[in-house]
Amino acid sequence: MDEAAGDLKQALPNTCDNVQIHVEVHQKSNSTAKKEDIRMSVLKLLNRHNIVFGDYKWTEFDDGFLNSNVQSVSIVDTELKLKERQPIDLSKSSLTIHIFHLNEEGPSIENLEEENEDIVAANHWVLPAAEFHGLWESLIYDTEVKSHLLDYVTTTLLFSDRNVDSNLISWNRVVLLHGPPGTGKTSLCKALAQKLTIRLSYRYRYGQLIEINSHSLFSKWFSESGKLVTKMFQKIQELIDDKDALVFVLIDEVESLTAARSAFKAGTEPSDAIRVVNAVLMQIDQIKRYPNVVILTTSNITEKIDMAFVDRADIKQYIGPPSAAAIFRIYLSCLEELMKCQIIYPRQHLLSLRELEMIGFVENNVSRLSLVLKEISRRSEGLSGRVLRKLPFLAHALYIQSPSVTMTAFLQALSLVVDKQFEERKKLADCV
Protein backbone atom coordinates (compact mmCIF):
# COMPACT_ATOMS: atom_id res chain seq x y z
CA MET A 1 0.00 0.00 0.00
CA ASP A 2 2.83 2.42 0.89
CA GLU A 3 4.49 1.63 -2.44
CA ALA A 4 1.29 2.38 -4.37
CA ALA A 5 0.79 5.66 -2.52
CA GLY A 6 4.41 6.55 -3.27
CA ASP A 7 3.86 5.91 -6.98
CA LEU A 8 0.90 8.26 -6.90
CA LYS A 9 2.84 10.99 -5.09
CA GLN A 10 5.67 10.71 -7.62
CA ALA A 11 3.19 11.14 -10.47
CA LEU A 12 1.79 14.42 -9.12
CA PRO A 13 2.98 17.50 -11.06
CA ASN A 14 5.07 20.35 -9.70
CA THR A 15 3.51 23.30 -7.89
CA CYS A 16 1.48 25.83 -9.82
CA ASP A 17 2.02 29.53 -9.17
CA ASN A 18 1.18 32.93 -10.68
CA VAL A 19 -2.54 32.12 -10.82
CA GLN A 20 -5.49 34.08 -9.45
CA ILE A 21 -6.95 32.34 -6.41
CA HIS A 22 -10.32 33.25 -4.90
CA VAL A 23 -10.68 32.92 -1.13
CA GLU A 24 -14.21 33.08 0.31
CA VAL A 25 -14.52 34.02 3.98
CA HIS A 26 -17.89 33.29 5.61
CA GLN A 27 -18.19 35.78 8.48
CA LYS A 28 -20.35 34.63 11.41
CA SER A 29 -23.81 36.21 11.55
CA ASN A 30 -23.18 37.69 15.01
CA SER A 31 -19.74 39.10 14.12
CA THR A 32 -19.26 42.85 13.89
CA ALA A 33 -15.53 42.69 13.17
CA LYS A 34 -14.18 45.00 10.48
CA LYS A 35 -13.54 43.33 7.13
CA GLU A 36 -9.99 44.67 6.98
CA ASP A 37 -9.17 43.05 10.35
CA ILE A 38 -10.60 39.74 9.13
CA ARG A 39 -8.69 40.05 5.88
CA MET A 40 -5.36 40.53 7.69
CA SER A 41 -6.00 37.48 9.90
CA VAL A 42 -6.94 35.37 6.87
CA LEU A 43 -3.73 36.39 5.09
CA LYS A 44 -1.73 35.23 8.13
CA LEU A 45 -3.58 31.89 8.00
CA LEU A 46 -2.78 31.48 4.30
CA ASN A 47 0.87 32.36 4.90
CA ARG A 48 1.09 29.49 7.39
CA HIS A 49 -0.52 27.02 4.95
CA ASN A 50 0.86 28.21 1.66
CA ILE A 51 0.71 24.94 -0.33
CA VAL A 52 -2.74 23.52 -1.14
CA PHE A 53 -4.04 20.87 -3.54
CA GLY A 54 -7.05 22.38 -5.29
CA ASP A 55 -10.02 23.66 -3.31
CA TYR A 56 -9.63 23.64 0.47
CA LYS A 57 -11.74 24.72 3.45
CA TRP A 58 -10.79 25.66 7.03
CA THR A 59 -13.53 25.53 9.69
CA GLU A 60 -11.30 25.43 12.77
CA PHE A 61 -8.56 27.95 13.54
CA ASP A 62 -5.72 28.33 16.04
CA ASP A 63 -6.33 32.09 15.89
CA GLY A 64 -8.82 33.27 18.54
CA PHE A 65 -9.96 36.23 16.42
CA LEU A 66 -10.84 33.96 13.47
CA ASN A 67 -12.57 31.45 15.75
CA SER A 68 -14.78 34.21 17.16
CA ASN A 69 -15.65 35.90 13.87
CA VAL A 70 -15.31 33.45 10.98
CA GLN A 71 -17.35 30.36 10.14
CA SER A 72 -15.06 29.16 7.35
CA VAL A 73 -12.25 30.15 5.00
CA SER A 74 -12.41 28.45 1.60
CA ILE A 75 -10.09 28.36 -1.39
CA VAL A 76 -12.59 27.93 -4.21
CA ASP A 77 -13.01 27.34 -7.94
CA THR A 78 -9.41 26.29 -8.58
CA GLU A 79 -10.67 23.67 -11.05
CA LEU A 80 -12.17 26.46 -13.20
CA LYS A 81 -8.69 27.82 -13.96
CA LEU A 82 -6.42 24.78 -13.55
CA LYS A 83 -7.01 21.87 -15.91
CA GLU A 84 -5.14 19.44 -13.70
CA ARG A 85 -5.06 18.93 -9.97
CA GLN A 86 -1.77 20.65 -9.12
CA PRO A 87 -0.23 21.81 -5.85
CA ILE A 88 -0.80 25.57 -5.59
CA ASP A 89 1.78 27.84 -3.97
CA LEU A 90 -0.35 30.56 -2.37
CA SER A 91 2.70 32.73 -1.67
CA LYS A 92 3.26 33.03 -5.44
CA SER A 93 -0.42 33.43 -6.36
CA SER A 94 -2.63 36.47 -6.71
CA LEU A 95 -5.12 36.19 -3.83
CA THR A 96 -8.56 37.80 -3.96
CA ILE A 97 -10.36 37.61 -0.62
CA HIS A 98 -14.17 37.87 -0.50
CA ILE A 99 -15.69 38.37 2.98
CA PHE A 100 -19.46 37.92 3.35
CA HIS A 101 -22.35 37.38 5.76
CA LEU A 102 -25.17 34.99 4.82
CA ASN A 103 -28.75 36.24 4.91
CA GLU A 104 -30.73 33.66 6.89
CA GLU A 105 -34.25 35.06 6.49
CA GLY A 106 -35.28 32.87 3.56
CA PRO A 107 -37.38 33.94 0.57
CA SER A 108 -40.24 36.42 0.66
CA ILE A 109 -43.20 36.25 -1.70
CA GLU A 110 -44.06 39.00 -4.17
CA ASN A 111 -47.81 39.23 -4.79
CA LEU A 112 -49.71 41.07 -7.51
CA GLU A 113 -53.29 42.10 -6.90
CA GLU A 114 -55.65 41.37 -9.80
CA GLU A 115 -59.46 41.52 -9.61
CA ASN A 116 -59.34 41.48 -5.78
CA GLU A 117 -57.21 38.34 -5.96
CA ASP A 118 -53.58 38.06 -4.85
CA ILE A 119 -51.42 36.29 -7.43
CA VAL A 120 -48.07 34.85 -6.29
CA ALA A 121 -45.85 36.40 -8.93
CA ALA A 122 -42.33 35.73 -7.64
CA ASN A 123 -40.03 34.56 -4.85
CA HIS A 124 -37.50 37.08 -3.62
CA TRP A 125 -34.16 36.42 -1.87
CA VAL A 126 -31.60 38.84 -0.47
CA LEU A 127 -28.14 37.50 -1.38
CA PRO A 128 -25.91 35.90 -0.36
CA ALA A 129 -28.57 33.60 1.13
CA ALA A 130 -27.99 30.75 3.58
CA GLU A 131 -30.35 28.63 1.46
CA PHE A 132 -27.92 28.66 -1.48
CA HIS A 133 -24.70 28.20 0.51
CA GLY A 134 -22.71 25.31 -1.03
CA LEU A 135 -25.02 25.04 -4.06
CA TRP A 136 -22.36 26.21 -6.54
CA GLU A 137 -19.89 23.54 -5.38
CA SER A 138 -22.52 20.78 -5.67
CA LEU A 139 -23.10 21.44 -9.39
CA ILE A 140 -20.73 19.44 -11.57
CA TYR A 141 -20.48 19.76 -15.36
CA ASP A 142 -18.21 18.35 -18.06
CA THR A 143 -17.65 21.58 -19.95
CA GLU A 144 -16.47 24.95 -18.66
CA VAL A 145 -20.06 26.16 -18.16
CA LYS A 146 -19.48 27.66 -14.71
CA SER A 147 -16.32 29.59 -15.60
CA HIS A 148 -17.88 30.89 -18.84
CA LEU A 149 -20.95 32.17 -17.01
CA LEU A 150 -18.83 33.86 -14.33
CA ASP A 151 -16.62 35.49 -16.94
CA TYR A 152 -19.62 36.61 -19.00
CA VAL A 153 -21.38 38.44 -16.18
CA THR A 154 -18.11 39.92 -14.90
CA THR A 155 -17.41 41.32 -18.39
CA THR A 156 -20.98 42.61 -18.66
CA LEU A 157 -20.65 44.59 -15.45
CA LEU A 158 -17.17 45.84 -16.41
CA PHE A 159 -18.45 47.18 -19.75
CA SER A 160 -21.35 48.87 -17.96
CA ASP A 161 -19.12 50.44 -15.32
CA ARG A 162 -16.74 51.78 -17.98
CA ASN A 163 -19.68 53.22 -19.98
CA VAL A 164 -18.93 51.27 -23.16
CA ASP A 165 -21.35 52.53 -25.84
CA SER A 166 -23.96 49.76 -26.21
CA ASN A 167 -24.91 51.11 -29.64
CA LEU A 168 -21.45 50.18 -30.88
CA ILE A 169 -20.95 47.00 -28.83
CA SER A 170 -24.21 45.29 -27.96
CA TRP A 171 -24.97 43.15 -24.93
CA ASN A 172 -28.31 42.48 -23.25
CA ARG A 173 -27.41 40.91 -19.88
CA VAL A 174 -29.58 37.90 -20.74
CA VAL A 175 -28.49 34.28 -20.19
CA LEU A 176 -30.50 31.31 -21.53
CA LEU A 177 -29.76 27.83 -20.17
CA HIS A 178 -31.59 25.07 -22.05
CA GLY A 179 -31.64 21.28 -21.95
CA PRO A 180 -33.59 18.30 -20.59
CA PRO A 181 -35.25 18.40 -17.14
CA GLY A 182 -33.18 17.49 -14.08
CA THR A 183 -29.84 18.80 -15.34
CA GLY A 184 -29.56 21.60 -12.77
CA LYS A 185 -30.38 24.65 -14.91
CA THR A 186 -32.45 26.46 -12.27
CA SER A 187 -30.01 25.54 -9.50
CA LEU A 188 -27.12 26.84 -11.61
CA CYS A 189 -28.90 30.18 -12.08
CA LYS A 190 -29.43 30.54 -8.32
CA ALA A 191 -25.87 29.44 -7.56
CA LEU A 192 -24.49 31.88 -10.15
CA ALA A 193 -26.41 34.77 -8.58
CA GLN A 194 -25.05 33.81 -5.15
CA LYS A 195 -21.47 33.41 -6.41
CA LEU A 196 -21.46 36.74 -8.24
CA THR A 197 -22.91 38.58 -5.24
CA ILE A 198 -19.94 37.30 -3.19
CA ARG A 199 -17.37 37.96 -5.94
CA LEU A 200 -18.63 41.51 -6.55
CA SER A 201 -19.14 42.51 -2.92
CA TYR A 202 -16.52 45.24 -3.39
CA ARG A 203 -18.89 46.85 -5.93
CA TYR A 204 -22.39 46.01 -4.60
CA ARG A 205 -23.39 45.77 -0.94
CA TYR A 206 -25.82 42.89 -1.52
CA GLY A 207 -27.69 40.96 -4.20
CA GLN A 208 -31.38 40.56 -5.01
CA LEU A 209 -32.75 37.45 -6.69
CA ILE A 210 -36.29 37.56 -8.09
CA GLU A 211 -37.58 34.20 -9.35
CA ILE A 212 -40.62 34.92 -11.50
CA ASN A 213 -43.45 32.38 -11.33
CA SER A 214 -44.13 32.17 -15.07
CA HIS A 215 -47.26 30.04 -14.77
CA SER A 216 -49.01 32.28 -12.25
CA LEU A 217 -48.53 35.31 -14.49
CA PHE A 218 -50.99 33.71 -16.88
CA SER A 219 -54.23 34.89 -15.27
CA LYS A 220 -57.44 32.94 -15.76
CA TRP A 221 -58.40 35.84 -17.99
CA PHE A 222 -55.57 35.34 -20.47
CA SER A 223 -55.88 38.86 -21.86
CA GLU A 224 -54.70 40.23 -18.48
CA SER A 225 -51.39 38.36 -18.56
CA GLY A 226 -49.59 41.10 -20.48
CA LYS A 227 -50.61 43.60 -17.79
CA LEU A 228 -49.39 41.24 -15.05
CA VAL A 229 -45.99 40.95 -16.73
CA THR A 230 -45.75 44.74 -16.84
CA LYS A 231 -46.72 45.02 -13.15
CA MET A 232 -44.11 42.42 -12.19
CA PHE A 233 -41.33 44.28 -13.98
CA GLN A 234 -42.42 47.55 -12.37
CA LYS A 235 -41.71 45.91 -9.00
CA ILE A 236 -38.34 44.74 -10.30
CA GLN A 237 -37.57 48.28 -11.45
CA GLU A 238 -37.88 49.45 -7.83
CA LEU A 239 -35.09 47.02 -6.86
CA ILE A 240 -32.89 48.06 -9.79
CA ASP A 241 -33.14 51.70 -8.72
CA ASP A 242 -30.99 50.83 -5.67
CA LYS A 243 -27.48 51.24 -7.10
CA ASP A 244 -25.96 49.35 -4.15
CA ALA A 245 -27.81 46.17 -5.19
CA LEU A 246 -26.92 43.65 -7.89
CA VAL A 247 -30.27 42.39 -9.20
CA PHE A 248 -30.84 38.98 -10.80
CA VAL A 249 -34.16 38.20 -12.50
CA LEU A 250 -34.72 34.45 -12.91
CA ILE A 251 -37.42 33.31 -15.35
CA ASP A 252 -37.75 29.53 -15.08
CA GLU A 253 -39.29 27.60 -18.00
CA VAL A 254 -39.25 30.79 -20.04
CA GLU A 255 -41.09 29.05 -22.88
CA SER A 256 -44.33 29.49 -20.89
CA LEU A 257 -43.91 33.27 -21.14
CA THR A 258 -42.52 33.45 -24.65
CA ALA A 259 -44.88 31.19 -26.62
CA ALA A 260 -43.57 31.07 -30.18
CA ARG A 261 -45.09 33.41 -32.76
CA SER A 262 -44.92 30.54 -35.23
CA ALA A 263 -47.49 28.69 -33.10
CA PHE A 264 -49.73 31.76 -33.27
CA LYS A 265 -49.39 31.89 -37.05
CA ALA A 266 -50.30 28.22 -37.22
CA GLY A 267 -53.43 28.97 -35.22
CA THR A 268 -52.40 26.95 -32.15
CA GLU A 269 -51.78 29.93 -29.84
CA PRO A 270 -54.33 32.65 -28.98
CA SER A 271 -53.54 36.21 -30.05
CA ASP A 272 -53.33 37.21 -26.37
CA ALA A 273 -50.20 35.03 -26.10
CA ILE A 274 -48.44 37.43 -28.46
CA ARG A 275 -49.25 40.29 -26.09
CA VAL A 276 -47.44 38.39 -23.32
CA VAL A 277 -44.40 37.82 -25.56
CA ASN A 278 -44.35 41.49 -26.51
CA ALA A 279 -44.69 42.55 -22.85
CA VAL A 280 -41.70 40.39 -21.81
CA LEU A 281 -39.52 41.61 -24.69
CA MET A 282 -40.41 45.24 -24.05
CA GLN A 283 -39.59 44.95 -20.33
CA ILE A 284 -36.26 43.26 -21.06
CA ASP A 285 -35.38 46.05 -23.47
CA GLN A 286 -36.19 48.63 -20.80
CA ILE A 287 -34.21 47.14 -17.91
CA LYS A 288 -31.16 46.15 -19.98
CA ARG A 289 -30.14 49.83 -19.88
CA TYR A 290 -29.31 49.50 -16.19
CA PRO A 291 -25.80 48.31 -15.26
CA ASN A 292 -26.80 46.38 -12.13
CA VAL A 293 -29.26 43.83 -13.55
CA VAL A 294 -28.77 40.35 -15.05
CA ILE A 295 -31.61 38.26 -16.51
CA LEU A 296 -31.24 34.48 -16.09
CA THR A 297 -33.63 32.18 -17.97
CA THR A 298 -34.09 28.42 -18.34
CA SER A 299 -36.00 26.23 -20.76
CA ASN A 300 -36.72 22.52 -21.08
CA ILE A 301 -38.25 22.98 -24.56
CA THR A 302 -35.98 25.27 -26.55
CA GLU A 303 -37.96 25.01 -29.81
CA LYS A 304 -40.99 26.62 -28.13
CA ILE A 305 -39.18 29.84 -27.22
CA ASP A 306 -39.88 32.89 -29.34
CA MET A 307 -36.87 33.58 -31.59
CA ALA A 308 -37.01 37.29 -30.74
CA PHE A 309 -36.28 36.29 -27.14
CA VAL A 310 -33.54 33.82 -28.13
CA ASP A 311 -31.82 36.58 -30.13
CA ARG A 312 -31.74 38.78 -27.02
CA ALA A 313 -29.77 36.17 -25.04
CA ASP A 314 -26.02 36.86 -25.07
CA ILE A 315 -25.25 33.33 -23.90
CA LYS A 316 -27.32 30.35 -25.03
CA GLN A 317 -25.84 27.42 -23.11
CA TYR A 318 -26.97 23.81 -23.47
CA ILE A 319 -26.95 21.88 -20.18
CA GLY A 320 -27.09 18.15 -20.87
CA PRO A 321 -26.97 14.95 -18.79
CA PRO A 322 -23.60 14.35 -17.09
CA SER A 323 -20.93 12.10 -18.62
CA ALA A 324 -19.38 9.18 -16.75
CA ALA A 325 -16.54 11.48 -15.60
CA ALA A 326 -18.97 14.05 -14.19
CA ILE A 327 -21.04 11.28 -12.59
CA PHE A 328 -17.88 9.99 -10.86
CA ARG A 329 -17.31 13.44 -9.36
CA ILE A 330 -20.97 13.69 -8.28
CA TYR A 331 -20.80 10.31 -6.53
CA LEU A 332 -17.44 11.25 -4.99
CA SER A 333 -18.97 14.36 -3.39
CA CYS A 334 -21.89 12.28 -2.05
CA LEU A 335 -19.58 9.66 -0.54
CA GLU A 336 -17.41 12.36 1.04
CA GLU A 337 -20.50 13.80 2.74
CA LEU A 338 -21.57 10.37 4.03
CA MET A 339 -18.06 9.76 5.42
CA LYS A 340 -18.10 13.17 7.09
CA CYS A 341 -21.41 12.26 8.78
CA GLN A 342 -20.01 8.78 9.67
CA ILE A 343 -22.78 6.94 7.83
CA ILE A 344 -19.94 5.39 5.84
CA TYR A 345 -17.33 4.29 8.41
CA PRO A 346 -14.38 3.94 8.64
CA ARG A 347 -13.25 6.70 6.30
CA GLN A 348 -11.64 5.55 3.06
CA HIS A 349 -9.50 7.66 0.74
CA LEU A 350 -10.94 7.59 -2.78
CA LEU A 351 -8.80 8.66 -5.72
CA SER A 352 -9.97 11.17 -8.30
CA LEU A 353 -10.13 10.19 -11.98
CA ARG A 354 -6.99 12.24 -12.58
CA GLU A 355 -5.13 10.30 -9.88
CA LEU A 356 -6.37 6.99 -11.30
CA GLU A 357 -5.17 8.04 -14.74
CA MET A 358 -1.72 8.92 -13.39
CA ILE A 359 -1.24 5.38 -12.05
CA GLY A 360 -2.57 3.87 -15.29
CA PHE A 361 -5.85 2.63 -13.70
CA VAL A 362 -3.86 -0.19 -12.12
CA GLU A 363 -5.80 -2.02 -9.40
CA ASN A 364 -4.15 -2.18 -5.97
CA ASN A 365 -5.12 -1.62 -2.35
CA VAL A 366 -5.17 2.16 -2.85
CA SER A 367 -7.18 2.22 -6.09
CA ARG A 368 -9.57 -0.75 -5.76
CA LEU A 369 -12.63 1.07 -4.35
CA SER A 370 -12.13 4.04 -6.69
CA LEU A 371 -12.13 1.70 -9.69
CA VAL A 372 -15.38 0.13 -8.44
CA LEU A 373 -16.90 3.61 -8.27
CA LYS A 374 -15.62 4.35 -11.78
CA GLU A 375 -17.45 1.29 -13.11
CA ILE A 376 -20.68 2.26 -11.29
CA SER A 377 -20.36 5.74 -12.82
CA ARG A 378 -20.03 4.26 -16.31
CA ARG A 379 -23.22 2.24 -15.79
CA SER A 380 -25.04 5.35 -14.52
CA GLU A 381 -24.73 7.25 -17.81
CA GLY A 382 -28.12 8.50 -18.98
CA LEU A 383 -29.35 9.49 -15.52
CA SER A 384 -29.84 13.17 -14.72
CA GLY A 385 -27.94 15.00 -12.01
CA ARG A 386 -31.18 15.29 -10.02
CA VAL A 387 -31.62 11.50 -10.02
CA LEU A 388 -27.94 10.78 -9.33
CA ARG A 389 -27.97 12.77 -6.09
CA LYS A 390 -30.97 10.76 -4.86
CA LEU A 391 -29.31 7.39 -5.44
CA PRO A 392 -27.04 7.35 -2.33
CA PHE A 393 -30.14 7.93 -0.18
CA LEU A 394 -32.06 5.19 -1.99
CA ALA A 395 -29.07 2.83 -1.73
CA HIS A 396 -29.09 3.21 2.05
CA ALA A 397 -32.89 3.06 2.39
CA LEU A 398 -33.39 -0.01 0.20
CA TYR A 399 -30.27 -2.10 0.82
CA ILE A 400 -28.52 -1.04 4.06
CA GLN A 401 -30.84 0.34 6.78
CA SER A 402 -28.16 0.50 9.47
CA PRO A 403 -26.58 3.52 11.21
CA SER A 404 -23.17 2.96 9.65
CA VAL A 405 -21.76 0.88 6.82
CA THR A 406 -18.37 0.20 5.23
CA MET A 407 -17.45 1.77 1.91
CA THR A 408 -17.34 -1.65 0.25
CA ALA A 409 -20.88 -2.49 1.34
CA PHE A 410 -22.17 0.94 0.38
CA LEU A 411 -20.73 0.71 -3.14
CA GLN A 412 -22.43 -2.68 -3.54
CA ALA A 413 -25.74 -1.07 -2.54
CA LEU A 414 -25.15 1.86 -4.90
CA SER A 415 -24.52 -0.56 -7.76
CA LEU A 416 -27.81 -2.36 -7.02
CA VAL A 417 -29.82 0.86 -6.89
CA VAL A 418 -28.40 1.99 -10.26
CA ASP A 419 -29.58 -1.30 -11.81
CA LYS A 420 -32.98 -0.84 -10.16
CA GLN A 421 -33.27 2.69 -11.55
CA PHE A 422 -32.83 1.48 -15.13
CA GLU A 423 -35.21 -1.46 -14.57
CA GLU A 424 -37.93 0.92 -13.35
CA ARG A 425 -37.37 3.20 -16.33
CA LYS A 426 -37.77 0.27 -18.71
CA LYS A 427 -41.03 -0.78 -17.03
CA LEU A 428 -42.38 2.77 -17.29
CA ALA A 429 -41.40 2.93 -20.97
CA ASP A 430 -43.11 -0.42 -21.64
CA CYS A 431 -46.33 0.90 -20.07
CA VAL A 432 -46.50 3.91 -22.37
From Swiss-Prot:
Membrane-crossing residue ranges in chain numbering: none
Gene Ontology biological process terms from the UniProt entry: double-strand break repair; meiotic recombination checkpoint signaling; oogenesis; reciprocal meiotic recombination; spermatogenesis; synaptonemal complex assembly
Keyword line: ATP-binding, Differentiation, Meiosis, Nucleotide-binding, Oogenesis, Spermatogenesis
One GO CC term, this protein: chromosome
Keyword DNA damage annotated: no
Pfam families in the record: AAA, AAA_lid_TRIP13_C, TRIP13_N
Top-level taxon: Eukaryota
Cysteines paired by S-S bonds: none
Positions with a binding annotation for ATP: 179-186
GO MF, any single term: ATP hydrolysis activity
SUPFAM superfamilies for the chain: P-loop containing nucleoside triphosphate hydrolases
Similarity section: Belongs to the AAA ATPase family. PCH2 subfamily.
PANTHER family on file: PACHYTENE CHECKPOINT PROTEIN 2, PACHYTENE CHECKPOINT PROTEIN 2 HOMOLOG
The protein's role, per its UniProt record: Plays a key role in chromosome recombination and chromosome structure development during meiosis. Required at early steps in meiotic recombination that leads to non-crossovers pathways. Also needed for efficient completion of homologous synapsis by influencing crossover distribution along the chromosomes affecting both crossovers and non-crossovers pathways.
Protein name per its UniProtKB record: Pachytene checkpoint protein 2 homolog
